[in-house]
Protein backbone atom coordinates (compact mmCIF):
# COMPACT_ATOMS: atom_id res chain seq x y z
CA UNK A 1 0.00 0.00 0.00
CA UNK A 2 1.31 3.46 -0.87
CA UNK A 3 2.30 5.67 2.04
CA UNK A 4 -0.27 8.33 2.78
CA UNK A 5 0.84 11.85 2.05
CA UNK A 6 0.23 14.37 4.78
CA UNK A 7 -2.38 16.78 3.46
CA UNK A 8 -2.38 20.03 5.39
CA UNK A 9 -5.98 21.17 5.25
CA UNK A 10 -6.56 22.01 8.91
CA UNK A 11 -4.54 24.22 11.26
CA UNK A 12 -2.03 22.26 13.34
CA UNK A 13 -1.84 22.56 17.14
CA UNK A 14 0.53 20.84 19.61
CA UNK A 15 -0.95 19.81 22.94
CA UNK A 16 -0.13 17.43 25.78
CA UNK A 17 -1.50 15.90 28.95
CA UNK A 18 0.02 17.03 32.25
CA UNK A 19 -0.72 16.17 35.88
CA UNK A 20 0.13 13.87 38.78
CA UNK A 21 1.23 10.26 38.26
CA UNK A 22 -1.70 7.78 38.03
CA UNK A 23 -4.33 10.48 37.65
CA UNK A 24 -5.12 9.10 34.19
CA UNK A 25 -3.11 11.14 31.66
CA UNK A 26 -2.36 8.18 29.38
CA UNK A 27 -5.87 6.74 29.72
CA UNK A 28 -7.28 10.12 28.71
CA UNK A 29 -4.88 10.33 25.75
CA UNK A 30 -6.05 6.88 24.58
CA UNK A 31 -9.71 7.82 25.12
CA UNK A 32 -9.39 11.02 23.04
CA UNK A 33 -7.68 9.07 20.26
CA UNK A 34 -10.40 6.38 20.31
CA UNK A 35 -13.41 8.70 20.47
CA UNK A 36 -12.17 10.94 17.64
CA UNK A 37 -11.07 7.97 15.51
CA UNK A 38 -14.47 6.29 15.82
CA UNK A 39 -16.16 9.53 14.83
CA UNK A 40 -14.09 9.52 11.63
CA UNK A 41 -14.06 5.76 11.10
CA UNK A 42 -10.27 5.35 11.42
CA UNK A 43 -8.02 3.27 13.69
CA UNK A 44 -7.06 4.73 17.06
CA UNK A 45 -3.75 4.49 18.89
CA UNK A 46 -4.30 2.09 21.79
CA UNK A 47 -3.32 2.53 25.44
CA UNK A 48 -0.43 0.02 25.47
CA UNK A 49 1.15 1.71 22.47
CA UNK A 50 0.98 5.13 24.13
CA UNK A 51 2.13 3.81 27.50
CA UNK A 52 5.17 2.09 26.03
CA UNK A 53 6.84 5.37 25.15
CA UNK A 54 9.95 5.20 22.96
CA UNK A 55 13.22 6.81 24.06
CA UNK A 56 14.29 9.95 22.28
CA UNK A 57 17.34 12.11 22.58
CA UNK A 58 16.92 15.87 22.72
CA UNK A 59 19.96 18.07 23.35
CA UNK A 60 21.88 15.05 24.62
CA UNK A 61 19.18 14.09 27.12
CA UNK A 62 17.23 10.84 26.92
CA UNK A 63 13.48 11.30 27.28
CA UNK A 64 10.62 8.83 26.97
CA UNK A 65 7.63 10.31 25.19
CA UNK A 66 4.72 9.20 23.06
CA UNK A 67 3.54 11.34 20.18
CA UNK A 68 0.14 10.57 18.73
CA UNK A 69 -1.96 12.52 16.28
CA UNK A 70 -5.68 12.95 15.92
CA UNK A 71 -8.15 15.33 14.32
CA UNK A 72 -11.23 17.20 15.36
CA UNK A 73 -13.57 18.74 12.79
CA UNK A 74 -11.56 21.96 12.74
CA UNK A 75 -7.99 21.00 13.67
CA UNK A 76 -5.13 18.54 13.41
CA UNK A 77 -3.47 17.82 16.78
CA UNK A 78 -0.12 16.36 17.75
CA UNK A 79 -0.47 15.11 21.32
CA UNK A 80 2.41 14.34 23.63
CA UNK A 81 2.22 12.06 26.64
CA UNK A 82 5.17 11.15 28.86
CA UNK A 83 5.06 8.20 31.26
CA UNK A 84 7.24 9.36 34.15
CA UNK A 85 7.39 12.64 36.06
CA UNK A 86 11.08 13.14 35.20
CA UNK A 87 10.19 12.69 31.51
CA UNK A 88 7.68 15.53 31.79
CA UNK A 89 10.15 17.83 33.46
CA UNK A 90 12.82 17.09 30.84
CA UNK A 91 10.32 17.38 28.01
CA UNK A 92 9.11 20.79 29.01
CA UNK A 93 12.49 22.23 29.92
CA UNK A 94 14.31 21.03 26.80
CA UNK A 95 11.44 22.01 24.54
CA UNK A 96 11.41 18.51 23.08
CA UNK A 97 7.66 18.88 23.18
CA UNK A 98 6.65 22.40 22.30
CA UNK A 99 3.11 22.65 23.59
CA UNK A 100 0.68 25.34 22.45
CA UNK A 101 -1.62 24.30 25.26
CA UNK A 102 -2.19 21.39 27.63
CA UNK A 103 -4.90 19.34 29.31
CA UNK A 104 -4.31 19.23 33.06
CA UNK A 105 -5.62 15.90 34.39
CA UNK A 106 -6.64 15.79 38.06
CA UNK A 107 -8.25 12.73 39.66
CA UNK A 108 -11.39 13.73 41.54
CA UNK A 109 -10.61 10.92 44.02
CA UNK A 110 -7.32 12.60 45.07
CA UNK A 111 -7.57 16.27 44.20
CA UNK A 112 -4.43 18.27 43.37
CA UNK A 113 -1.23 16.42 44.35
CA UNK A 114 2.44 17.56 44.48
CA UNK A 115 3.11 16.90 40.78
CA UNK A 116 -0.12 18.69 39.83
CA UNK A 117 1.43 21.79 41.35
CA UNK A 118 4.84 21.13 39.77
CA UNK A 119 3.39 20.69 36.30
CA UNK A 120 1.36 23.90 36.59
CA UNK A 121 4.50 25.77 37.68
CA UNK A 122 6.49 24.23 34.82
CA UNK A 123 3.82 25.18 32.30
CA UNK A 124 3.98 28.75 33.62
CA UNK A 125 7.82 28.82 33.54
CA UNK A 126 8.26 27.44 30.03
CA UNK A 127 5.45 29.48 28.50
CA UNK A 128 2.52 27.06 28.02
CA UNK A 129 -0.17 29.71 28.39
CA UNK A 130 -3.40 27.80 27.88
CA UNK A 131 -4.63 24.97 30.09
CA UNK A 132 -7.93 23.09 30.05
CA UNK A 133 -8.74 20.95 33.11
CA UNK A 134 -10.10 17.40 32.97
CA UNK A 135 -11.37 16.19 36.36
CA UNK A 136 -11.00 12.45 35.95
CA UNK A 137 -12.48 9.46 37.84
CA UNK A 138 -15.60 11.41 38.85
CA UNK A 139 -17.53 8.11 38.62
CA UNK A 140 -15.63 6.92 41.72
CA UNK A 141 -16.76 9.86 43.87
CA UNK A 142 -20.27 9.48 45.24
CA UNK A 143 -20.64 12.96 46.65
CA UNK A 144 -21.11 15.69 44.03
CA UNK A 145 -20.00 18.29 46.61
CA UNK A 146 -16.59 16.63 46.87
CA UNK A 147 -16.11 16.96 43.12
CA UNK A 148 -17.00 20.65 43.38
CA UNK A 149 -14.49 21.09 46.21
CA UNK A 150 -11.75 19.51 44.08
CA UNK A 151 -12.66 21.83 41.22
CA UNK A 152 -12.36 24.84 43.54
CA UNK A 153 -8.98 23.64 44.78
CA UNK A 154 -7.69 23.22 41.22
CA UNK A 155 -8.94 26.68 40.24
CA UNK A 156 -7.23 28.26 43.27
CA UNK A 157 -3.99 26.44 42.47
CA UNK A 158 -4.09 27.71 38.86
CA UNK A 159 -4.69 31.28 40.03
CA UNK A 160 -1.74 30.97 42.41
CA UNK A 161 0.51 30.47 39.36
CA UNK A 162 -1.02 33.36 37.39
CA UNK A 163 -3.33 31.28 35.22
CA UNK A 164 -6.92 32.60 34.94
CA UNK A 165 -8.21 30.05 37.48
CA UNK A 166 -11.77 31.41 37.49
CA UNK A 167 -12.14 31.25 33.71
CA UNK A 168 -10.29 28.08 32.75
CA UNK A 169 -12.72 25.45 31.44
CA UNK A 170 -13.12 22.38 33.67
CA UNK A 171 -14.62 19.21 32.17
CA UNK A 172 -15.61 16.31 34.46
CA UNK A 173 -15.77 12.64 33.57
CA UNK A 174 -14.14 9.22 33.44
CA UNK A 175 -11.43 8.60 30.84
CA UNK A 176 -11.53 4.85 31.53
CA UNK A 177 -15.31 4.62 31.00
CA UNK A 178 -14.95 6.60 27.76
CA UNK A 179 -12.21 4.22 26.63
CA UNK A 180 -14.54 1.29 27.41
CA UNK A 181 -17.18 2.90 25.18
CA UNK A 182 -19.69 4.23 27.74
CA UNK A 183 -21.87 6.51 25.53
CA UNK A 184 -22.32 9.18 28.22
CA UNK A 185 -18.54 9.41 28.78
CA UNK A 186 -17.83 9.40 25.04
CA UNK A 187 -19.94 12.59 24.93
CA UNK A 188 -17.78 14.05 27.72
CA UNK A 189 -14.61 13.44 25.67
CA UNK A 190 -16.28 15.10 22.67
CA UNK A 191 -17.13 18.06 24.90
CA UNK A 192 -13.53 18.16 26.17
CA UNK A 193 -12.15 18.33 22.62
CA UNK A 194 -14.71 20.97 21.57
CA UNK A 195 -13.41 22.99 24.53
CA UNK A 196 -9.77 22.45 23.54
CA UNK A 197 -10.70 23.54 19.98
CA UNK A 198 -12.24 26.77 21.18
CA UNK A 199 -10.13 27.64 24.24
CA UNK A 200 -6.57 26.92 23.08
CA UNK A 201 -5.83 29.44 20.33
CA UNK A 202 -4.16 28.56 17.07
CA UNK A 203 -0.42 29.18 17.47
CA UNK A 204 1.26 32.01 15.63
CA UNK A 205 3.09 30.50 12.68
CA UNK A 206 6.88 30.52 12.89
CA UNK A 207 7.02 32.44 9.60
CA UNK A 208 4.98 35.30 11.11
CA UNK A 209 7.55 35.92 13.85
CA UNK A 210 10.55 38.29 13.51
CA UNK A 211 13.46 36.79 11.55
CA UNK A 212 16.17 35.02 13.60
CA UNK A 213 19.02 32.75 12.51
CA UNK A 214 21.77 31.47 14.82
CA UNK A 215 25.11 31.55 12.98
CA UNK A 216 26.68 28.09 12.70
CA UNK A 217 29.50 28.77 10.28
CA UNK A 218 31.18 31.70 8.56
CA UNK A 219 33.19 31.63 5.35
CA UNK A 220 34.42 33.98 2.65
CA UNK A 221 33.58 33.78 -1.03
CA UNK A 222 36.37 35.50 -2.92
CA UNK A 223 35.14 38.59 -4.69
CA UNK A 224 31.69 38.38 -3.11
CA UNK A 225 32.18 38.73 0.61
CA UNK A 226 31.30 37.00 3.86
CA UNK A 227 28.66 34.29 4.15
CA UNK A 228 27.00 33.25 7.41
CA UNK A 229 25.29 29.87 7.36
CA UNK A 230 22.74 28.32 9.70
CA UNK A 231 19.15 27.21 10.11
CA UNK A 232 16.49 29.89 10.11
CA UNK A 233 14.88 29.65 13.54
CA UNK A 234 11.83 31.78 12.79
CA UNK A 235 10.50 34.38 10.42
CA UNK A 236 11.34 35.05 6.79
CA UNK A 237 14.43 36.56 5.17
CA UNK A 238 14.37 38.18 1.73
CA UNK A 239 17.32 39.38 -0.34
CA UNK A 240 18.01 43.08 0.18
CA UNK A 241 16.75 43.12 3.78
CA UNK A 242 18.64 44.97 6.49
CA UNK A 243 19.47 42.79 9.50
CA UNK A 244 21.56 42.95 12.69
CA UNK A 245 24.39 40.71 13.86
CA UNK A 246 23.78 40.25 17.58
CA UNK A 247 25.65 38.55 20.43
CA UNK A 248 29.08 37.87 22.00
CA UNK A 249 30.12 41.50 21.44
CA UNK A 250 28.77 44.62 23.12
CA UNK A 251 28.01 46.45 19.90
CA UNK A 252 25.43 45.34 17.37
CA UNK A 253 26.41 45.47 13.70
CA UNK A 254 23.90 46.32 10.95
CA UNK A 255 24.28 44.82 7.48
CA UNK A 256 22.25 44.04 4.36
CA UNK A 257 21.70 40.54 3.00
CA UNK A 258 22.77 40.66 -0.65
CA UNK A 259 22.17 37.00 -1.46
CA UNK A 260 20.64 33.80 -0.03
CA UNK A 261 21.71 30.29 -1.01
CA UNK A 262 20.22 26.92 -0.16
CA UNK A 263 21.54 23.60 -1.53
CA UNK A 264 23.79 25.65 -3.85
CA UNK A 265 20.77 27.35 -5.40
CA UNK A 266 20.00 31.04 -5.07
CA UNK A 267 16.78 31.96 -3.29
CA UNK A 268 14.87 35.24 -3.05
CA UNK A 269 13.39 34.23 0.26
CA UNK A 270 14.25 31.83 3.09
CA UNK A 271 11.86 30.86 5.87
CA UNK A 272 11.78 29.14 9.26
CA UNK A 273 13.34 25.67 9.00
CA UNK A 274 15.54 26.38 5.96
CA UNK A 275 19.29 25.76 6.14
CA UNK A 276 20.84 28.68 4.28
CA UNK A 277 23.92 30.73 3.60
CA UNK A 278 23.39 34.51 3.75
CA UNK A 279 25.79 36.81 1.92
CA UNK A 280 26.40 39.90 4.06
CA UNK A 281 27.37 43.30 2.65
CA UNK A 282 30.40 45.07 4.11
CA UNK A 283 31.09 42.51 6.84
CA UNK A 284 34.65 41.26 7.34
CA UNK A 285 35.28 37.62 8.11
CA UNK A 286 36.49 38.59 11.60
CA UNK A 287 33.42 40.68 12.43
CA UNK A 288 31.05 37.73 12.71
CA UNK A 289 31.35 34.35 14.45
CA UNK A 290 29.51 31.18 15.35
CA UNK A 291 27.18 31.74 18.32
CA UNK A 292 25.98 35.15 17.16
CA UNK A 293 22.57 35.52 15.53
CA UNK A 294 21.28 37.32 12.46
CA UNK A 295 18.04 39.05 13.40
CA UNK A 296 15.41 41.55 12.34
CA UNK A 297 16.65 44.96 13.62
CA UNK A 298 15.51 45.68 17.17
CA UNK A 299 13.93 42.25 17.69
CA UNK A 300 16.52 40.76 20.06
CA UNK A 301 19.14 42.17 22.43
CA UNK A 302 22.18 40.79 24.21
CA UNK A 303 22.06 39.99 27.90
CA UNK A 304 24.43 38.60 30.49
CA UNK A 305 22.24 38.03 33.51
CA UNK A 306 19.02 36.03 33.69
CA UNK A 307 16.99 33.56 35.73
CA UNK A 308 16.36 30.06 34.43
CA UNK A 309 14.45 26.89 35.21
CA UNK A 310 16.97 24.06 34.95
CA UNK A 311 16.83 20.27 35.04
CA UNK A 312 20.13 18.78 36.23
CA UNK A 313 20.92 15.35 34.81
CA UNK A 314 21.28 12.46 37.24
CA UNK A 315 24.43 10.35 37.35
CA UNK A 316 22.57 7.53 35.52
CA UNK A 317 21.71 9.92 32.69
CA UNK A 318 25.37 10.78 32.21
CA UNK A 319 25.27 13.89 34.37
CA UNK A 320 27.40 14.96 37.32
CA UNK A 321 28.12 12.54 40.17
CA UNK A 322 28.32 15.27 42.81
CA UNK A 323 26.23 18.31 43.79
CA UNK A 324 27.15 21.88 42.82
CA UNK A 325 26.96 25.11 44.79
CA UNK A 326 26.69 28.87 44.21
CA UNK A 327 29.60 30.10 42.02
CA UNK A 328 29.56 26.90 39.96
CA UNK A 329 30.99 27.87 36.53
CA UNK A 330 29.89 25.56 33.71
CA UNK A 331 29.37 26.44 30.03
CA UNK A 332 25.93 27.42 28.79
CA UNK A 333 25.27 26.31 25.23
CA UNK A 334 23.05 28.92 23.54
CA UNK A 335 22.10 28.77 19.87
CA UNK A 336 25.35 27.34 18.51
CA UNK A 337 28.08 28.03 21.06
CA UNK A 338 29.25 27.58 24.66
CA UNK A 339 29.60 30.62 26.93
CA UNK A 340 30.91 30.32 30.49
CA UNK A 341 28.65 31.63 33.23
CA UNK A 342 28.47 31.80 37.01
CA UNK A 343 25.54 30.25 38.87
CA UNK A 344 23.91 31.86 41.87
CA UNK A 345 21.49 29.62 43.76
CA UNK A 346 18.36 31.11 45.36
CA UNK A 347 18.31 31.95 49.06
CA UNK A 348 17.80 28.84 51.14
CA UNK A 349 19.15 26.47 48.47
CA UNK A 350 22.56 25.36 49.61
CA UNK A 351 23.34 22.92 46.82
CA UNK A 352 21.86 21.25 43.76
CA UNK A 353 21.97 17.47 43.43
CA UNK A 354 22.12 15.54 40.15
CA UNK A 355 18.48 14.80 39.17
CA UNK A 356 17.13 18.03 40.68
CA UNK A 357 14.96 20.62 39.00
CA UNK A 358 15.80 24.13 40.18
CA UNK A 359 15.46 27.85 39.41
CA UNK A 360 18.69 29.85 39.62
CA UNK A 361 20.41 32.98 38.38
CA UNK A 362 23.17 32.94 35.76
CA UNK A 363 25.67 35.63 34.84
CA UNK A 364 27.53 35.01 31.58
CA UNK A 365 31.05 36.27 30.88
CA UNK A 366 30.04 37.44 27.36
CA UNK A 367 26.72 38.94 26.27
CA UNK A 368 24.48 36.57 24.29
CA UNK A 369 21.32 37.18 22.21
CA UNK A 370 18.77 35.94 24.73
CA UNK A 371 15.02 36.24 25.23
CA UNK A 372 12.49 34.75 27.60
CA UNK A 373 11.66 31.14 26.74
CA UNK A 374 15.00 30.43 25.05
CA UNK A 375 16.29 26.88 25.60
CA UNK A 376 19.90 26.07 26.45
CA UNK A 377 22.02 23.22 27.75
CA UNK A 378 24.49 23.26 30.62
CA UNK A 379 27.78 21.59 29.74
CA UNK A 380 31.06 20.66 31.34
CA UNK A 381 33.94 19.86 29.03
CA UNK A 382 31.57 19.16 26.14
CA UNK A 383 29.30 16.84 28.19
CA UNK A 384 25.70 17.83 28.82
CA UNK A 385 24.96 18.04 32.55
CA UNK A 386 21.66 19.92 32.43
CA UNK A 387 19.04 21.69 30.35
CA UNK A 388 17.26 24.95 30.96
CA UNK A 389 14.78 27.57 29.83
CA UNK A 390 15.30 31.31 30.32
CA UNK A 391 12.43 32.47 32.54
CA UNK A 392 13.38 36.08 33.30
CA UNK A 393 15.91 38.55 31.86
CA UNK A 394 17.69 40.61 34.50
CA UNK A 395 20.35 42.55 32.63
From Swiss-Prot:
**Where does this one sit in the cell?**
Cytoplasm
Region (G4): which ranges?
136-139
- What are the boundaries of the region G3? 81-84
EC number annotated for this UniProt entry: 3.6.5.3
> Could you say which residues bind GTP here?
19-26, 81-85, 136-139
* Gene Ontology MF terms: GTP binding; GTPase activity; translation elongation factor activity
Query: Which GO cellular component terms are attached?
Result: cytosol
Q: Where is this region: G5?
A: 174-176
Q: Which residues bind Mg(2+)?
A: 26
Which keywords appear in this protein's UniProt record, sorted alphabetically?
Cytoplasm, Elongation factor, GTP-binding, Hydrolase, Magnesium, Metal-binding, Nucleotide-binding, Protein biosynthesis
Q: Catalysed reaction per UniProt?
A: GTP + H2O = GDP + phosphate + H(+)
Among the Pfam families in the record, one is GTP_EFTU_D3
Principal localization reads cytoplasm
Give the function comment from the record.
GTP hydrolase that promotes the GTP-dependent binding of aminoacyl-tRNA to the A-site of ribosomes during protein biosynthesis.
Quaternary structure (record): Monomer.
Name of the protein: Elongation factor Tu
* Organism phylogeny: Bacteria, Bacillati, Bacillota, Bacilli, Lactobacillales
Amino acid sequence: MAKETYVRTKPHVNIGTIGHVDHGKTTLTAAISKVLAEKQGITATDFAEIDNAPEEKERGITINTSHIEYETETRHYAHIDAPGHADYVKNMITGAAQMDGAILVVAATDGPMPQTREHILLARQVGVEYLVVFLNKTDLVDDEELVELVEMEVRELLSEYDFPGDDIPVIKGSALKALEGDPEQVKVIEELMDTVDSYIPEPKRETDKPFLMPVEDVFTITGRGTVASGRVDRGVLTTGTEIEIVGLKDEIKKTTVTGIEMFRKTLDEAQAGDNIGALLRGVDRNEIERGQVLAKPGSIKTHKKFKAEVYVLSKEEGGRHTPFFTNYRPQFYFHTTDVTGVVELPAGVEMVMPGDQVTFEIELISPVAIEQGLKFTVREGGHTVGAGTVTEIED
